[in-house]
C-alpha cells in the first residue's frame, strides 16, 4: 500500500519511462495525481528518460520537445522536481544503450540541450511556483485494499482495476 509506505518517508516519488511509443498524457497524469496523493502534497519525478530506453521491445527516442512537455506536465500535476536517468553512458552492460545526457567521454548528447532548456525554464518559473498547490474540482478514490481484494476474488475474469480507474480518470 503506497499510502502506508509513504507515511514515514520525506517525499513521494516515481520513475516515468515511456519505453515504446510516446507520451500518454492521461496515464501519466493519473500516476502523477496518485503519487501526489500518497503524501497529500507535491512529489518528485526521480527518474525519467533522456532520449530512448534500453529495455523495451522497440526503443524509440522521444520527439524533439517531448521531454520538455513531459517535464511541464509533471509540474502541472504537482511535481517539485524532475530528474533524469542517467547522466553519463555506462561503460558496459545493458545500460550502456540507455539514453543519457552526456556520452562516455562527457560530450553532450542531443537531449542535453533540451534538458538544459527545461532547467532554465524551471529556474525562471520556480519563484512563481514555490509553495503552490494543485487544486482539483473532483477526486477519484483509490483503495489498495479493494484493488488487492478484487485481484484475489475477481467477479469477472476481464476486470482490470487499474484500467477501470484510468477509464474514469
Model-derived segments and their meaning:
Residues 6-169:
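Carbohydrate-binding surfaces of carbohydrate-active enzymes
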Amino acid at each position: 500500500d503506497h499510502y502506508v509506505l509513504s507515511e514515514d518517508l520525506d517525499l513521494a516519488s516515481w520513475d516515468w519511462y515511456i519505453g515504446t511509443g510516446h507520451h500518454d498524457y492521461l496515464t501519466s497524469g493519473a500516476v502523477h495525481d496518485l503519487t501526489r496523493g500518497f503524501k497529500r502534497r507535491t512529489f518528485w519525478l526521480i527518474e525519467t528518460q533522456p532520449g530512448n530506453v534500453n529495455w523495451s521491445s522497440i526503443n524509440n527516442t522521444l520527439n524533439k520537445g517531448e521531454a520538455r512537455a513531459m517535464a511541464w506536465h509533471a509540474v502541472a500535476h504537482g511535481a517539485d522536481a524532475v530528474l533524469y536517468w542517467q547522466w553519463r553512458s555506462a561503460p558496459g552492460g545493458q545500460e550502456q544503450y540507455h539514453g543519457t545526457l552526456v556520452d562516455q567521454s562527457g560530450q553532450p548528447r542531443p537531449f542535453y540541450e533540451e534538458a538544459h532548456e527545461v532547467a532554465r525554464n524551471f529556474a525562471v518559473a520556480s519563484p512563481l511556483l514555490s509553495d503552490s498547490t494543485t487544486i482539483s474540482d473532483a477526486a477519484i478514490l483509490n483503495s489498495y485494499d479493494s484493488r488487492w481484494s478484487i485481484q484475489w476474488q475477481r467477479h469477472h475474469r476481464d476486470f482490470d482495476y487499474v484500467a477501470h480507474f484510468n477509464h474514469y480518470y
